[in-house]
A protein has these predicted regions:
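ATP-dependent adenylation/nucleotidyltransferase module used to activate substrates
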Residues: 1-162, 203, 218, 234-248, ...
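A short, acidic, flexible beta-alpha connecting loop/helix-capping segment that sits on the rim
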Residues: 254-261
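A broad detector of the eukaryotic-type serine/threonine protein kinase catalytic domain
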Residues: 19, 95, 181, 223-225
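A short interface-forming secondary-structure element
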Residues: 213-215, 219-232
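Short, low-order "capping/linker" segments at domain edges
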Residues: 261-270
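C-terminal boundary motif of the adenylate-forming
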Residues: 207-214, 254
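Generic alpha-helical secondary structure
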Residues: 103, 187-194, 232-236
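Mid-to-C-terminal catalytic subdomains of enzymes
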Residues: 118, 147-153, 157-201, 207-209
Length: 270
C-alpha cells in the first residue's frame, strides 16, 4: 500500500472502534493518532495523559496546548512511579514494569467514561528496537492502530505535515529514565538535574539531545552535524560550567552522536 492507502486503512481501523481513548504523550506518534481519531470519531474520542516524574514539564505543556488547539477532550492521571521500588531499581525490564503501571492508571482514569477501547501510538518501526514496554501494551489489550496500519515514523511525520500538525518535525523524545545506566537506581533529584541539563542544551539551540548519566559523568549525545557548534570554546565552556553547577564532575561528548536507545546497546549484545 502507498502512504495514503495506509492512511485510509488507519481511518477505517479507527472507525470500527466506535469510540476511543488515546494514551497521549504529546509526541509525534500519539499526536497524529489523536488527531486522526478525532477527525474520524469526533467527540467520541478522548485524550488521556499520564503525569509522572519521568516526563518533563515541557512535554506535558505541549500536550495540553495541542488538545486545547484541536478542542479535544483531555484528562490526566497521576502516576507516582518511583513509589515502586522495582522500577526505581532500574532493571533491564524497567520499561515493561513502568508501562504496566502507567496503563493500569490510564485504564482506571478512563473507566468512568465508558470507552470500549484504549489506543497508544506505537508505529511499524518500533519492532526494530528493544521495546519491552510493548509486552504490557499487549497484556492490557491496548490497541496500536498505527502499527496495525503499517505506518512508519517517517510516514507519520509526512502525514502529520500534510495535516498541519506542529508535531510533524518534533524531535523524538524518550522518558527521562532512559538516561540512566540499567542497574543504577533512579532518583527523583537526578531526574530534575537531567531535565535541567537537557533544557539548557535546547535553549542553546541544539535539536536532538540526550544527557545520559554515568555516576558523576554527563555523556552528551547530539546530532553529529552539530559537533562543530558544541566544540566551539565559548559554547563548550558554557555547557561545562552549567552542568558542573547542576552537580556533574565531568562533562563528555559521545563521539557517535545521538542514537535511539544507546543505553540498550550492551543488553542487545547479550
Amino acid at each position: 500500500m502507498n502512504l495514503h492507502e495506509k492512511y485510509k486503512n488507519l481511518k477505517n481501523i479507527i472507525k470500527d472502534y466506535g469510540n476511543l481513548a488515546v494514551a497521549f504523550s504529546g509526541g509525534v506518534d500519539s499526536a497524529f493518532l489523536l488527531k486522526t481519531a478525532f477527525d474520524v470519531l469526533g467527540d467520541r474520542v478522548m485524550a488521556v495523559t499520564a503525569r509522572l516524574c519521568f516526563c518533563p514539564d515541557r512535554e506535558l505543556k505541549e500536550a495540553i496546548e495541542f488538545c486545547e488547539k484541536e478542542k479535544i477532550r483531555h484528562i490526566f492521571c497521576d502516576v507516582e512511579i518511583l513509589e515502586s521500588e522495582a522500577i526505581a531499581q532500574n532493571p533491564t525490564n524497567r520499561c515493561y514494569l513502568c508501562k504496566n503501571e502507567i496503563l493500569n492508571k490510564i485504564k482506571q482514569a478512563v473507566e468512568p467514561f465508558d470507552f470500549k477501547y484504549i489506543a497508544e501510538g506505537s508505529n511499524a518501526d518500533d519492532s526494530k528496537y528493544y521495546r519491552p514496554g510493548f509486552q504490557a501494551v499487549t497484556e492490557h489489550k491496548i490497541k496500536s492502530p498505527l502499527k496495525e496500519a503499517g505506518l512508519s515514523k517517517s510516514e507519520i511525520r509526512e502525514l502529520s505535515k500534510e495535516l498541519g500538525l506542529p508535531t510533524w518535525n518534533k524531535q523524538s523524545y524518550a522518558c527521562l529514565a532512559s538516561r540512566f545506566v540499567y542497574g543504577d537506581k533512579i532518583i527523583a533529584e537526578k531526574l530534575v538535574i537531567i531535565d535541567k541539563a537537557e533544557q539548557f542544551l535546547i535553549d542553546l539551540g541544539f535539536s536532538q539531545i540526550r544527557v545520559r548519566i554515568h555516576g558523576s559523568i554527563a555523556r552528551i549525545e547530539i546530532n553529529p552535524d552539530e559537533f562543530a557548534k558544541i566544540i566551539k570554546p565559548e559554547i563548550s565552556r558554557e555547557i561545562y560550567a552549567e552542568l558542573k553547577l547542576l552537580g556533574f564532575s565531568y562533562v563528555t561528548l559521545d563521539l557517535l552522536g545521538y542514537r535511539f536507545g544507546s543505553m540498550d546497546e550492551e543488553i542487545l549484545k547479550k
